Amino acid sequence: MDVRPYLPADRDACLAVFDSNAPDFFKSHERRDFEGFLDRGAVPYFVMEHDGAIIGCGGYFVTEQKAVARLVWGMVRRDWRRQGLGRFLLLFRLRQITKAGGVEMVHLDTSPDSASFFQSQGFKLARVAKDGYAPGLDRVEMTMKLTVCP
């Protein structure tokens, strides 16, 4: 399993990963948001590859408060889920955030179906916004205090 920085040539493969998770984890209107995010390329974003095929992607950014990072657009292709790859990608991003230095708290938002995964990795529920993504799809906001062991 390799993880590397996203390149514009990865766009279609990342959109295919997104599409494999719709409509269960993403609603159709979110695809435009994801396309715009990929096209802007404004934050650290990574792709996970297996034998040259992109099977996952995810990124983060450090907020203006500097001590807070936010995980964004993390996903694993549907046919590769339930194999520990979501955890692998999450830990990779947390290591990148740690390397950036100065970050004390990590925030994310996710769907209710994925919230238990993040809770199992140490994230705490901050709040639930009913219909926050779309009618019938709540937005779950979660946080984790980032601790670095010497």
Language model feature labels by segment:
Residues M1-C14:
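A short beta-loop-alpha structural element at the N-terminal edge
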Residues L7, T63, R77, S111:
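Residue-level recognition of the GNAT/N-acetyltransferase active site
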Residues D24-H50:
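Active-site rim helix/loop that mediates acceptor-substrate recognition in acyltransferases
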Residues V43, G102-M105:
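Short, high-confidence coil segments that cap the C-terminus of an alpha-helix
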Residues V47, A53-V62, V68-M75:
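Conserved beta-strand in the GNAT
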Residues V76, R82-R95:
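Conserved acetyl-CoA-binding loop-helix of GNAT-fold acetyltransferases
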Residues M105-D109, Q119, K124-E141:
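Conserved catalytic-core motifs of GNAT/GCN5-like acyltransferases
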